[in-house]
Amino acid sequence: MELLREFLRNYGERFKEELENLVKKYVQGEEDVVLLKMDERCLILPFLNVGDFFYMKARELTEPVKLEVLQKRDSEVLARAISYEETYIEKRQHVRVQPDKPIPVYIKEKDTVGSILDISVGGIGVFLKEKVVEPEEVVTLEFELEGEEIKTKGECRYTIPYRAGYRAGFKFVDLSTRYENIIGRYVMKRQMEILKELKESMI
């Protein structure tokens, strides 16, 4: 339940409650379909109907997963994850995912290698051992994603102390359509993987 605790928003955001107070059991479904057994005291339950949308938050995502109600019987709701392509296009500046394994990123002008903490088609968060960049600096970022080499400019938005080093946030500058598509596909893939992990953790 830990990955599901942050919150559950209904389609109109008329009510907000912690997921642990709403869901009795989280059951794995087929592919991107899940069965939620809701607490009958859940305030949004009477308002959820077939075709409605609601959102479920996972710790690894900065944006909720959008779900569509397929069936509803008493306190059970069968829902399907909506196309992540639609989600990242609508909110692509904000939907970030954490890599499942370390991804090194080379900052050319500083001759420094960092590690990607999170990524979206809008930018990346990078772990650095030393504070080598300042806000508003534009640098060249080079990294590999799913076997594809990416080289693009990034503007540093902030640098803050983080663990035993620093976290720097970069906004991509003039990202090409090709690179945007590569990153977008990766983000969607990771969202699907995270949703699967989230379901499996509740079995």
From Swiss-Prot:
What are the PilZ domain coordinates in residue numbering?
90-188
Matches recorded under InterPro entries: PilZ_domain (IPR009875)
Q: Which Pfam families does UniProt cross-reference here?
A: PilZ
Tell me the GO molecular function terms.
cyclic-di-GMP binding
Family stated for the protein in its record: To A.aeolicus aq_820 and aq_1583.
The protein's name is Uncharacterized protein aq_1211
